[in-house]
């Protein structure tokens, strides 16, 4: 082995250690991730050829090694104690008074405050700057040796940086899993059909206690330091906060929210600030930790039983509690989604009394295996809707019963559907369901549907709230006199609305189909249906097999269409609309052997049209057999360009696509 290989190995190790600190501690990377990965691969290659050169501080150990049969035990030289808790300002005041009373002649001036991370406490022992041991807290006296696993956590330096560190230094802190990493871990587990973790704390603990460190290496774990234990060979600062800064200078990350304050009132303000920002933080916390900053006063205060007298955890209101699931009700949302809602024995959680929690959908009920009567764990975080996160199955009563999804909508009685591959169950009575009424009516009168001037969202909401309309057909039964009872609706405005409704009765089949709000039937699909079947009766009677023959209609959309027209209540509204006078020009069938002018052509509209509205031009093109798209590509056959055409025209010219004018379109329409 040459000296150059050994020198390169040391260079790579030093560089990787340096850049890990820049990335994980200082949040200020100097090189791209790809360059870091390249150096790591080079290091792994050298060590693979020369395994005798692998040292305990090698960055290569972050990928994990051979599985252990069990964890060995570690006795803590300085006990790892837990903290007493405060749950309100009065208890915090009591902590401060007790501490102040014990140090007569000294004034406690400053406190060091930090978020209380919801993870796993660990001890890191460095000798001569190299990480030689990592252990869990265990019972405070004895923990488990998790050195191999901790070495895989990128945020923890295998070798200290800078200078001035003690020859033996024990750093204590919290291993945790950031929220984003937790979500991604569970998402991947669901895709693979594997068990998911209940919360980030369980995920962090489970990941850190793997006998196979390669599994730990694959988990998104991080670390923040919060104190020291053993210190030999150097003197640290006499301030808890300044010790944090020393530790950080040696390459160990500290929580960026850590702050030194000058009074108990500032401690309380810090607590409120962190509580307010809790949900926005990248990691889970369950309170704040408050420590006397002066180390000399810490030493005078000492410890009592299992906890220091100089520190306390000011806990947030609990985000999880246990209660009984008494019943399940099914609510229908504005789009027809049916959501199971757990009716709970009221419980105080997350700062409020909770009596309802979402169960999301049938898949979630199946995953939880929850039943009515179960003892369940409820979680409420910030403004998030409370949810059932787990079931205590060993407490299940004999009277517990299965939760069954309804076959009919609990609001309107229409059939419900659940498309294969979708989690949501929906009501099919979009035109009649009270829960969906406002959204259905707003869609019906929208510009791309019946296009009724004067019937904006606020008018629709008033009409529904006053129970003046139930279905779209009821709109055409309104008189100007009736409409004047609405807010900001004078006689003239009311007359204009009635006239607009009358005008909208003459429409087109594509617009009418679109106005019905059939799931996933947009403008293009409605146009394709009209062009293929030519009339409404044929569409209503079409089978799924026939519908799939239509351009751009697949199995799912075909199912939505047959389900919609298969619901008698929807059919009744359609017939009522026709009875109110809605009509459209007949779509002529093409003559035998004669193709439509733009049959099979893909076209794009761009620019300002002087004689046609954009929707009108689009409908005309579709009636001429064209497929209208929104962007120019190699598949585009014709670009119809109006005035002030911009980038689409330039791209069409570049691709050599045929370009026509608005007048060309008008000529085709004659």
Curated annotation (Swiss-Prot):
Residues reported to bind Zn(2+): 409, 412, 427, 433
BRCT domain residues: 593-670
One Gene Ontology cellular component annotation held by this UniProt entry: cytosol
InterPro entries noted in UniProt: BRCT_dom (IPR001357), BRCT_dom_sf (IPR036420), DisA/LigA_HHH (IPR041663), DNA_ligase (IPR001679), DNA_ligase_AS (IPR018239), DNA_ligase_CS (IPR033136), DNAligase_adenylation (IPR013839), DNAligase_N (IPR013840)
Cofactor(s) required, per the database record: Mg(2+); Mn(2+)
Matching CDD domains: BRCT_DNA_ligase_like, LIGANc
Binding site for NAD(+): 33-37, 82-83, 114, 137, 174, 291, 315
Residue stretches in coiled coil: none
Cysteine pairs bridged by disulfides in the record: none
Keyword field contains DNA damage: yes
Top-level division of the source organism's lineage: Bacteria
Catalysed transformations (reactions): NAD(+) + (deoxyribonucleotide)n-3'-hydroxyl + 5'-phospho-(deoxyribonucleotide)m = (deoxyribonucleotide)n+m + AMP + beta-nicotinamide D-nucleotide
Keywords: DNA damage, DNA repair, DNA replication, Ligase, Magnesium, Manganese, Metal-binding, NAD, Zinc
Name the UniProt record assigns to this protein: DNA ligase
Function, in words: DNA ligase that catalyzes the formation of phosphodiester linkages between 5'-phosphoryl and 3'-hydroxyl groups in double-stranded DNA using NAD as a coenzyme and as the energy source for the reaction. It is essential for DNA replication and repair of damaged DNA.
Pfam families: BRCT, DNA_ligase_aden, DNA_ligase_OB, DNA_ligase_ZBD, HHH_2, HHH_5, Nlig-Ia
Single GO molecular function: DNA ligase (NAD+) activity
EC number: 6.5.1.2
Enzyme active site: 116 (n6-amp-lysine intermediate)
Entry's family note: Belongs to the NAD-dependent DNA ligase family. LigA subfamily.
Cited PANTHER family: CHROMOSOME TRANSMISSION FIDELITY FACTOR 18, DNA LIGASE
Biological process terms in GO annotation: DNA repair; DNA replication
